[in-house]
From Swiss-Prot:
GO terms for cellular component: cytosol; ESCRT I complex. One of its GO terms (biological process) is ubiquitin-dependent protein catabolic process via the multivesicular body sorting pathway. Residues 189-199 have a biased composition (Low complexity). Residues 285-328 have a biased composition (Polar residues). This is Ubiquitin-associated protein 1. Disulfide bonds: none annotated. GO terms for molecular function: ubiquitin binding. Residues 19-65 form the UMA domain. CDD domains: UBA1_UBAP1, UBA2_UBAP1_like. Component of an ESCRT-I complex (endosomal sorting complex required for transport I). The UMA domain mediates association with the ESCRT-I complex. It is found in: Cytoplasm, Cytosol; Endosome. Disruption phenotype: Impaired motor neuron outgrowth, leading to decreased mobility and shorter lifespan. Axon lengths is significantly shorter in motor neurons.
Amino acid sequence: MAARKSGSDIHNNGPVSYLDDVPFKLNEKFRCPSKVGLPIGFCLSDCNAILSDLQYDFNLERRTVQWGEELAKARAAEARAAEAIRTDSESERQAASQDAEVGLVGGKKARPSDEQDIVPPALKPVLAGLSHNAILTPLPAPSFGQTRPAPSNPAPQYLNLADFEREEDPFDKLELKTLDDKEELRTILQSQPQSSVSPPQLPPAEHRPVSPSTTPPLQAKTGIFHKPNGLVGLLDLDRGGVLGGQIDADRPCNIRSLTFPKLSDPGDSPLETPLSVYPVAPPRNLSNGTPPSLQRTASNNNTTLPQEQPVFAQNGTPKQSNPVTVTSHPPAGTTLLSLSPSERQCVETIVGMGYSYEGVLKAMQRQGQNVEQVLEYLFTHSRLCDRGFDATAVEECLEMYQGSEEKALEFLQLMSRFGEMGFERDTIKEVLLVHNNDQDKALEDLMTRATAS
């Protein structure tokens, strides 16, 4: 800061300072500090003489290089120590694995558990290795000799949870195990009501005891109907019991025929018997040697069954019909004998699953002898019947729409809906076929026809 003072300024305006030739006035109380002088006798030494006499020895640089060399040596020593530790651990691991192998083979004492290698959890229960899945092994096939009575108190079967940790699927043979278990099948049969198995009306003459002389031929014939999938004939279950005397011994176990009546229709009586339960005749010998399951006559099989087909009145509302006497006609021997061996095997396979001979034969007439197609047709037929539709109408719709469940269900629902409105069944069917199940167009056509008539 340049400060210039002039006498005139001091006299007139007081002390004035200048900054870059710009005057400004300071406060009157401001006083400039006094000058500081050097102490007496103070003098600066000659630096050039001092520097010329100084000799630099490079001690700092030498110390720095020494520190770097020591650090490199320390790092190399640490690397050698780590390599030695890794080598020792690998050698110990190899020795431990060899000791474990020798201990398992030669019977040496095993090492403590903390020194052993960790075994995967799934292999711990089966270290010894099981040869087979013993818990789900199928039972042996029924023998052709004299059957021995089953013990009243069978030995309990214990569940081995280790079998479920193996790689193979424990449920592969579950179906065979279930179907071959005679005790379970006997429990199922004995738990069913007697009215669902035996017909309510049978002539007294048909309840003839089976003589011992006729038993061996029937036992010899069971091999003909032995199924590779493990189905068990009722002959091997309980020959001397009440059910054994009323059920055909050569007929495979029909689980579906032992179910309770359908509960889908609230108007059905609880005493009604499902149509899948066919009246059976006691086992008897035939002169031509044909198994009784292939030759069944309908002369003595008349029984009283309710008619399940709904009958529509003039106003279209369904009414409950009274039970009528119908005659069940199992397929004659000539019908099955006229089939080819492949067709007969297809029939026996599907019948063994619980379906009736009549239903299987009808399905085969429409679908051929492909088991998958026949089963698909039967499944569709069963689902539609479970919805409460008439079996005959279901078969007609499936044949009309080539097995399409969606179109058949739509047709049956519209038939039922228009029938409740009071239209004629034949007219409804004709209109639905013309308009391809179009509800609005079909209803308009029905109203037009009703108005015209």
